[in-house]
């Protein structure tokens, strides 16, 4: 009775029909190992080899495969709130965290390749990047102010040239009218001379 109790406390609890074969194989392993140990201990002829029946490994392998396949099916769709579900959730969280760290590391390496004067330390790379961005923004602001100033100067110059062009155009028109008046006066004077010459003759 004591022997049976020592074996029974090693047996796994039954949680479903699929574990009957697993329990059988587990019991056979215990009996076989226990029998082998006692036979060797009480063998009066140590020099003689004791032949023991081979364990049914095929049955054990098939049982293990059945249990493994059953376990895989359970792991594919674990019940919400179960230990497997929390384990899968933790593994998923760890995978997401690992990818996030890899993305951050790749981004810092890319910054180190772009920003001049960076060291290998990640903290120094980030500080140098912040300084570089500030300097770029300052340069951008200076370029914007310079562009606005140049635009104002260009607009003022264009306005001055437009006024000068209008003044020159007005002067040209007055000069042209004066020329036309002088031409008319010259033609009128020629006509008077012709009349006087004809009258004298």
From Swiss-Prot:
Record flagged with keyword DNA-binding: yes
SUPFAM superfamilies: HLH, helix-loop-helix DNA-binding domain (SSF47459)
Biased segments, Polar residues type: 59-74
Region of interest (Disordered), residue spans: 53-74
One of the protein's GO biological processes: regulation of transcription by RNA polymerase II
Cellular compartments annotated: Nucleus
Pfam families on file: HLH
InterPro entries: bHLH_dom, bHLHzip_scCBP1-like, HLH_DNA-bd_sf
GO cellular component: nucleus
Keyword Cytoplasm: no
bHLH domain span: 88-136
Signal peptide coordinates: none
Gene3D superfamilies xrefs: Helix-loop-helix DNA-binding domain
Alphabetized UniProt keyword annotations: DNA-binding, Nucleus
Listed GO MF terms: DNA-binding transcription factor activity; DNA-binding transcription factor activity, RNA polymerase II-specific; protein dimerization activity; RNA polymerase II cis-regulatory region sequence-specific DNA binding
Designated name of the protein: Uncharacterized bHLH domain-containing protein C3F10.12c
């Amino acid at each position: 009775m004591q022997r049976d109790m020592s074996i029974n406390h090693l047996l796994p609890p039954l949680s479903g029909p699929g574990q009957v074969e697993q329990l059988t194989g587990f019991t056979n392993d215990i009996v076989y190992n226990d029998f082998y140990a006692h036979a060797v201990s009480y063998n009066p002829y140590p020099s003689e080899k004791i032949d023991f029946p081979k364990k049914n490994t095929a049955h054990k392998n098939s049982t293990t495969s059945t249990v493994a396949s059953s376990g895989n099916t359970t792991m594919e769709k674990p019940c919400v709130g179960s230990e497997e579900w929390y384990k899968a959730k933790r593994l998923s969280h760890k995978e997401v965290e690992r990818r996030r760290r890899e993305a951050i590391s790749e981004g810092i390496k890319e910054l180190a390749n772009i920003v001049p004067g960076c060291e290998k330390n990640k903290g120094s790379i980030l500080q140098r990047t912040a300084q570089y961005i500030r300097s770029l923004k300052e340069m951008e602001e200076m370029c914007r102010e310079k562009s606005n100033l140049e635009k104002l100067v260009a607009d003022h110059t264009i306005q001055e040239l437009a006024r000068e062009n209008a003044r020159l155009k007005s002067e040209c028109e007055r000069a042209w009218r004066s020329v036309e008046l002088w031409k008319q006066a010259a033609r009128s004077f020629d006509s008077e001379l012709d009349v006087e010459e004809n009258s004298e003759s």
